[in-house]
């Protein structure tokens, strides 16, 4: 557990090193702030608050009660379509870039997203591991909150899998060759958007724990949904529940 929280400090330090970029770039604009930018400044202030530690306790008997019991409830709870997310992504993200070479020239505006204590990054075929600072902070907060929820219930720790991050125009074109449902106007092109798989979780092995059983995947999915739903209700993100891609499609606001 000490290793987990020690590594978290490293992750937090990397994000704090560039956390003021998005705030400064918005504040430095000579134009009046629109509603999207004003909301983004509020989200930045919210995400910059220290993460409050939780008390770890023994797992209570029985399953936890969740509102997420059917596919329809998931879809109704996360209804934010592409056009809603796209307007925010275009306003707050980087310009869409043609290819990864061009994206590399914007790395001073991006945060590298790699494996961390709270999530794993899948092998990325159609995206590259970068996000704007606000989105990177949001991703960590969601997955940190998921770990907190597990520990507060006495469950073993699991890490969700991130399956998509920044996409170039070339990435989008290649993806559309194999996935006809992929949008040409992808929010992923602006570095504000990421996908978290809802049916793949990797357990954090504790050598000292030989008794705790694995958690049912549906229970993990519902618990992750609870955390993401809380963030959406706070106004930190837009979320679409993707059935065919088996992921939560999330854009930082």
Description of each model-found segment:
Residues 39-42, 60, 131-138, 142, ...:
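Stable alpha-helical elements in mature extracytoplasmic
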Residues 121-134, 160-162, 206-218, 251-252:
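Second-shell loop/turn segments in exported
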Residues 1-13:
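Hydrophobic membrane-insertion alpha-helices, especially the h-region
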Residues 140-143, 147, 155-177:
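Extended, low-complexity, intrinsically disordered C-terminal regulatory tails
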Residues 106-155:
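Active-site acidic/histidine clusters and adjacent loop/turn architecture
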Residues 183-253:
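Catalytic cores and adjacent binding grooves of peptidoglycan-active enzymes
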Residues 59-100:
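N-terminal low-complexity, intrinsically disordered segments
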């Amino acid at each position: 557990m000490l290793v987990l929280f020690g590594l978290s400090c490293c992750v937090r330090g990397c994000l704090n090193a560039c956390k003021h970029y998005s705030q400064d770039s918005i504040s430095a604009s000579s134009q009046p702030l629109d509603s999207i930018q004003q909301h983004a400044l509020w989200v930045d202030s919210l995400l910059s608050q220290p993460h409050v530690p939780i008390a770890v306790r023994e797992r209570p008997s029985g399953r936890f009660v969740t509102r997420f019991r059917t596919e329809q409830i998931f879809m109704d709870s996360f209804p934010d379509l592409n056009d809603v997310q796209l307007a925010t992504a275009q306003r707050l993200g980087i310009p869409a870039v043609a290819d990864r070479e061009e994206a590399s020239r914007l790395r001073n505006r991006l945060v590298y997203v790699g494996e961390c204590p709270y999530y794993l990054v899948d092998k990325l075929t159609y995206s590259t591991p970068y996000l704007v600072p606000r989105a990177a902070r949001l991703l960590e907060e969601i997955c940190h909150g998921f770990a907190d929820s597990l520990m507060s219930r006495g469950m073993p720790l699991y890490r969700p899998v991130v399956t998509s991050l920044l996409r170039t125009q070339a990435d989008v074109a290649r993806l559309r060759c194999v996935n006809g449902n992929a949008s040409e106007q992808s929010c992923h092109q602006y570095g504000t958007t990421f996908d978290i798989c809802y049916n793949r979780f990797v357990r954090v092995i504790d050598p000292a724990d030989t008794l705790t059983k694995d958690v049912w995947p549906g229970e993990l999915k519902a618990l992750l949904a609870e955390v993401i739903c809380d963030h959406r209700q706070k106004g930190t993100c837009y979320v679409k529940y993707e059935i065919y891609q088996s992921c939560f499609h999330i854009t930082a606001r």
